[in-house]
């Protein structure tokens, strides 16, 4: 069968039961072509991770966990149960990161429950930026690696070589940047710079004169992951404001009411913002590295 014929073959997403709910997020965009790669397993890994990194609060996580279990048990529509299963996994990541951040309804985790953060998001901005960039680098490199696999499947050897070299450049440049902050890594700075200088001419041979600019675009993609820190910081600041306004109220009942209303708003915003930004990072920065959209959903005339 010719490649152009394969591209018109209807597709079915087949994944293990625990991955199937995440097909819901993949189906929000046109399906991958028959010759492309199903991104569902990778969405199942990275989407909850990004969600938890952004929201990262024990109290919010438990509330979302209860909402997820309720949706799974009570919802009649399959799409709602799938959304509940996605939220269930994401809420667990939210609790885990909440422990790391020492946050439970904002800074109440530290003030009332004695939680000791491994990293304080309000004061450790630079480490959080580095962590976000590290996660982004891994995500982009995984996407490029899948692009190599996709190119080899399509017998596009030149494209596979280009993407492989791009991965090496990204890793080398990341190592060079890390060498300025880690004394041990400084020992390999020279060899890494030499490797980049050797790889660039080969990149031009395989991808044309604009190939280095294409690689630069990958670093632009990685910088986009700083939003994992920025949006998360906005969430914790809103929680802090809610607690302070509640504490400044003249009455206990007024304070409790204010706290409930503001934290409810923050939870709703905390579900919406991480979802949108996590999906954006997948759809724009990740899928573009390997997935060919345009697949037609297989709809059998009859099922047994």
Model-derived regions: residue spans:
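Conserved, carboxylate-rich catalytic/transport cores that coordinate ions
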Residues: 1-304
């Amino acid at each position: 069968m010719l490649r152009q014929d394969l591209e018109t073959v209807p597709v079915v997403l087949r994944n293990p039961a625990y991955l199937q709910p995440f097909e819901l997020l993949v189906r929000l965009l046109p399906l991958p072509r028959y010759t492309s790669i199903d991104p569902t397993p990778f969405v199942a890994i990275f989407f909850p991770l990004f969600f938890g990194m952004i929201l990262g609060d024990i109290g919010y996580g438990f509330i979302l966990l209860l909402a997820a279990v309720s949706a799974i048990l009570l919802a009649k529509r399959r799409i709602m149960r799938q959304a509940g299963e996605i939220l269930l996994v994401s809420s667990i990541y939210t609790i885990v990161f909440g422990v790391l951040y020492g946050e439970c309804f904002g800074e109440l985790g530290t003030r009332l429950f004695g939680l000791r953060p491994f990293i304080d998001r309000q004061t450790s901005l630079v480490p959080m930026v580095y962590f976000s960039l590290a996660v982004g680098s891994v995500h982009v490199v995984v996407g490029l690696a899948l692009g190599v696999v996709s190119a080899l499947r399509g017998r596009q050897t030149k494209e596979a070589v280009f993407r492989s070299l791009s991965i090496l450049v990204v890793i080398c440049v990341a190592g060079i940047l890390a060498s300025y902050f880690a004394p041990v890594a400084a020992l390999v700075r020279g060899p890494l710079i030499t490797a980049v200088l050797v790889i660039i001419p080969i990149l031009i041979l395989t991808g044309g004169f604009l190939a280095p600019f294409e690689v630069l675009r990958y670093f632009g993609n990685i910088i986009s992951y700083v939003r994992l820190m920025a949006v998360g910081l906005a969430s914790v600041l809103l929680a802090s404001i809610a607690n302070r306004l509640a504490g400044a109220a003249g009455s206990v009942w007024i304070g409790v009411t204010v706290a409930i209303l503001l934290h409810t708003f923050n939870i709703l915003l905390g579900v919406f913002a991480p979802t949108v930004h996590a999906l954006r990072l997948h759809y724009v920065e990740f899928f573009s590295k390997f997935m060919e959209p345009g697949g037609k959903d297989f709809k059998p005339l009859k099922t047994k």
